[in-house]
């Protein structure tokens, strides 16, 4: 009988330890860059890949003709969430068309982030088949229940070959991160580390937060090195916005018009291959870069030789006239000072893109169809190329963006996707 208290104590300790030992792990997905479109995809289920769209509010895929719609009534909370954000091309497909009258179930309006096309589609139940992770390796397979919208195959136009839909990663309740968080009981945040260039090895996305380790320095957790800035809410837009206080080239502030950066803000957008700048920001930025590069040559650096521009870029150079280093071409650095006062610095690897043999261009593009100072458009749209080899943490609960540039000896493609025993 004397042993009974010890047995009770042992059971009590086991019960107290249970939550820690059964803590739900984040969900892992490899991120592949498509060489033809420069878009990024993740596997979704059973060989089907979907494009990751950091500004997309929904998950959508093509469906079999005989698919069964989910029984979401037209006035249900899920139906309202699925139709909370409409793309401009869907503006006429509003409340009067939310119902499939033949089945009296909810319809949503999936949107192609490249062409801008949209179409009506049933909401369905699906599964995101992936692996949990400890931040070092995959741990075990998991099937995450999710709600998605069906889309006709014509909506796949201009997406990567083999893609069957889009996974929206925006700050909406039916975007993939929020659905994973709800089903897996993990934080509503995700890590994104896009692979550099056209590497065959994938980058990594982790839904639910860190840690995050890479093989080059396996003891180093890059989520501990993040600088943070607030995420800014935009009415009627679930995309991830931040504010930018200033832009500098070679540590000299670019003389953009007063309030230009504050008007419209900045948005992170994987659907754009390169960073877009509104004209009132683009012109002074490009001029500042060109002058800084000339000054660099006059001060003893390599003299860059301009060549005929290659669309959509304006400043292009002969690569033989640019010194190549471990951090890319030796060109003036570009620094974004974000709302928190932290600096997001871009070296030659992030500012210059080789467009053909012997030619590299400044990888920033003027935004089209938008007037200078138009607050309905962002001043800066940070594209996928400039996000590559950078650990990004989108934290929807704390409403902040974390960012950390990887050192030259580490790549987003160096996550160890070998499952642990």
Regions found by a protein language model. Give the residues of each.
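Cleavable N-terminal signal peptides of Sec/SRP-targeted secreted and luminal proteins
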Residues: 3-22
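Aspartic protease catalytic domain
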Residues: 6, 34, 46, 52-57, ...
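Short N-terminal segments immediately surrounding and downstream of signal-peptide cleavage
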Residues: 22-38
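Signature of the N-terminal lobe/flap region of pepsin-like aspartyl proteases
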Residues: 35-146, 150-159, 302
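Cytochrome P450 catalytic domain signature, combining two hallmark sequence patches
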Residues: 66-90, 181-184, 188, 218-226, ...
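Glycine-rich flap/beta-hairpin and adjacent strands of clan AA aspartyl proteases
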Residues: 113-222, 227, 336, 341-407
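Flexible, small-/acidic-enriched active-site or ligand-binding loops
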Residues: 202, 206-264, 361
